[in-house]
A protein has these predicted regions:
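SAM-dependent methyltransferase
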Residues: 91-172
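C-terminal lobe and adjacent flexible extensions of AdoMet/dcAdoMet transferase-like proteins
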Residues: 165-208
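Class I SAM-dependent methyltransferase SAM/SAH-binding core
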Residues: 2-47
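A short SAM/SAH-binding and catalytic strip from SAM-dependent methyltransferases
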Residues: 55-69
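A short acidic, Gly/Pro-enriched loop at the edge of an enzyme's catalytic core
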Residues: 47-57
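A short glycine-rich, Lys/Arg-flanked "PGG" loop and its adjoining helix->strand segment in the class I
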Residues: 71-86
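A cross-domain feature marking catalytic cores of carbohydrate-active enzymes
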Residues: 61, 89-91
Length: 208
């Protein structure tokens, strides 16, 4: 990410490390929050951190869905957490969450998905600097995947396109993987109060 989550934790007195496998994202985070700690590494590499390092690990927004081998992810996190430590993961109801990006949703407190027969999957934004952004969320439940296709049209006429492949099994499947590895489900937090409908935080604990 760009360092916002680790900065928020730091502001509340929690010292942490931001992990990303993209050097560009690490550099961007350092530009924005130069006093915080970051590590270039892969969550799927068990050697990224030493065993029993952390009291808490967070996996927020759609990070978990970029990870295909979720069993390896949970195994590594189990190793890196201290006994009794917590993992917080952000999951969505894949069939009902709103895939419209926040900047493209004209309804701040009302989900337009509740007032249409067909799920809205397109985002269109024109920024103040003249850049136009389009995105489309394509969902393939038969193989537990989704694709987010993005197009950036800049003021000078240049166009950049990119695709994000997401691996989206059901919440039940993901949580079952975690439980089979040994995590205990401690709490489920509905994110509707912060305008993320059909999205949840799950607090999992490593046994003592």
């Amino acid at each position: 990410g760009t360092g916002h989550h680790i900065a928020s934790l730091d502001a509340h007195g929690y010292k942490g490390i931001g992990l990303d496998k993209s050097s560009a994202m690490i550099n961007k985070s350092k530009e924005t929050y130069p006093d915080l700690n970051y590590k270039l590494g892969d969550v799927l590499n068990s050697m990224t951190f030493s065993p029993n390092t952390f009291t808490h690990i967070t996996c927020l927004y759609f990070t978990i869905y970029y990870i295909q081998d979720k069993q390896l992810f949970f195994n590594n996190v189990m190793s890196w957490l201290k006994p009794g430590g917590y993992l917080v993961i952000h999951l969505v109801d894949r069939d009902n969450f709103d895939p419209i990006l926040p900047g493209g949703d004209p309804f701040l407190y009302i989900s337009p998905q509740n007032y249409t027969d067909k799920r809205i999957t397109n985002t269109n934004i024109t920024f103040k600097n003249g850049m136009k952004y389009k995105a489309n969320f394509e969902y393939y439940p038969q193989n537990d995947t989704s694709v987010l296709k993005e197009t950036f049209k800049f003021k000078d006429g240049n166009i950049r396109q990119q695709e994000h492949k997401l691996f989206m099994p059901t919440q039940r499947k993901i949580l079952t993987l975690a439980k089979n590895i040994g995590f205990k489900l401690i709490k489920k937090i509905d994110l509707l109060p912060v305008q993320y409908e059909n999205q949840y935080l799950y607090v999992l604990q490593k046994p003592n």
